[in-house]
Amino acid sequence: MMELQLDFFSVTSFIIFFLFLFRLVWDWKNSTDEKLPPGPSKLPIIGSLHHLFGRNVDLPYYALTDLAKIYGPLMHLQLGKMSLVVASSAKMFKELMKENDLAISQRPVPYVARVLEDAGRDIAFVPYGDYWRQIRKISRMELFSVRKVQALHYIREDQSSKLIESIRASAGSVINLSKEVSHYTSTVVARAAFGSGCKDQDKFIRLSLEMVAAAGAVSTLPDMFPLLGFISVISGKKAFLKNIQKEADKILDVIIDEHIQRMKSKGYEEGESDKEDIVDVLLRLERTGELEISITPQDIKAVIWSVFAGGTDTSSTTTLWVMSELMRNPKVMEKVQAEVREMLKGKTEIYESDIQDLTYMRAVMKEALRLRIPGPLLLPREAMEPLEVDGYVIPAKTKILFNAWAVTRDPEIWKDPESFIPDRFIENPIDYKGTNYEFTPFGSGRRICPGMNFGIANVELPLAKLLYFFDWKLPYGMKPDDLDMTAKFGVVCGRKNDLHLIPTPYDP
């Protein structure tokens, strides 16, 4: 009897496997379309995946850039079940993000986001539709408007002063600047999100950083081969990620409830205020009936997670790449410090109103965003209908990936693109706000990063203070060329190794 059961199980397993294999081969054969953009050859089941092997898999934008040199700036890849079109030129960026922006306003939800309970309700991956339009409007008009970002200056001023105090306490010694900057950025984002009265703020920051790191470690294979979702289950990564979210959500539940109780105790009399945090704003909009679609506490948590995921690592990564490039380029460091110290001469404290005319420092920031773009592969889009682009057809449901790294290093656009040359942005109208397709670190069109102004503000003030209050030296007798500039690909593309420097106080 046992043998019959085993035989039945074996036969059933074989039939299921055979049908699965047949379906994959059938899908592969029927995915061939002469009008698709050109791309590398495909094999059954894996598609074009084998062409990425041996091409720096750890940094996939390198591999995609190499393939684009062979197959062109609009390239099709079949990665398992995923049909992917990769754009690698400013011309293709404009064609897609401007001329076809509405048709590709959908954003595919990756497997790692689907693991979490809030998938599809956060700012980054909310599906195109009425709720997306509402959350986009709230982000632009309420959460991250220029006025709102400016109103939060007191948080950045306070936290950047604490950053300087912490560094000054270790002056003359080797410090881990990566940890210092990460703590500053995370605390600014936390205070902007839910105020400064949260007793578990540090715990939530720790959990959010762990969650971003854990999300970056989850395999992307299930996006290409859905049946391989079990990998993250048996590896424990799925459970680990969900446990972090569960623990952090308990803190957010308390924070939201405290905000509601505080509003009730004040009789809802305060209304809009420059010192409202994100939770305050969302609760006010819900209470006053200004929203067409009701926002639940779960939606508020999803927004907060979006702000942390998009606002912490991106800003701290940018600051650290700026400092890294300045340490590698002493003449640029000398020039930018001369500007900062001349403009702020004699000041013992620096406010945001003091740094509005630091033209060269902003050029340094732009050049760092070009050369060391935090998101070298912009968050993908999805075609909601068939498109014709540059004579090729992109079928509906095709994922569209923008290789911004390839564009910001295109020698046809940028002279000496591998070099750090901030002067290229002096008296140059090119900006990062989404209308110059050769420089789109925050994306463009309907899906441009809504927190762009917030992210830039979180870099400018601490950077000005780091350059003003300290002279900087590499440790252990290192020379500029010795500094390791290896990147690590993840949710953002930051330094693989922490940045260790020696600060010496500058007497203004």
Curated annotation (Swiss-Prot):
Belongs to the cytochrome P450 family. PROSITE patterns: CYTOCHROME_P450 (PS00086). One of its GO terms (cellular component) is membrane. This is Dihydroniloticin synthase CYP71CD4. It comes from Ailanthus altissima (Tree-of-heaven). Monooxygenase involved in the biosynthesis of quassinoids triterpene natural products such as ailanthone, chaparrinone, glaucarubinone and amarolide, allelopathic degraded triterpene lactones inhibiting the growth of other plants, and possessing antimalarial, antifeedant, insecticidal, anti-inflammatory and anticancer activities. Catalyzes the conversion of tirucalladienol to dihydroniloticin. Pathway: Secondary metabolite biosynthesis; terpenoid biosynthesis. GO terms for molecular function: heme binding; iron ion binding; monooxygenase activity; oxidoreductase activity, acting on paired donors, with incorporation or reduction of molecular oxygen. The chain crosses the membrane at residues 6-26. It is a single-pass membrane protein. It catalyses: tirucalla-7,24-dien-3beta-ol + 2 reduced [NADPH--hemoprotein reductase] + 2 O2 = dihydroniloticin + 2 oxidized [NADPH--hemoprotein reductase] + 2 H2O + 2 H(+). Heme binds at residue 449. Its cofactor is heme. Gene3D superfamilies: Cytochrome P450 (1.10.630.10). Its EC number is 1.14.14.-. The keyword Transmembrane applies. PANTHER family: CYTOCHROME P450 FAMILY 71 PROTEIN, PREMNASPIRODIENE OXYGENASE-LIKE. Mainly expressed in roots and, to a lesser extent, in stems. The gene is CYP71CD4.
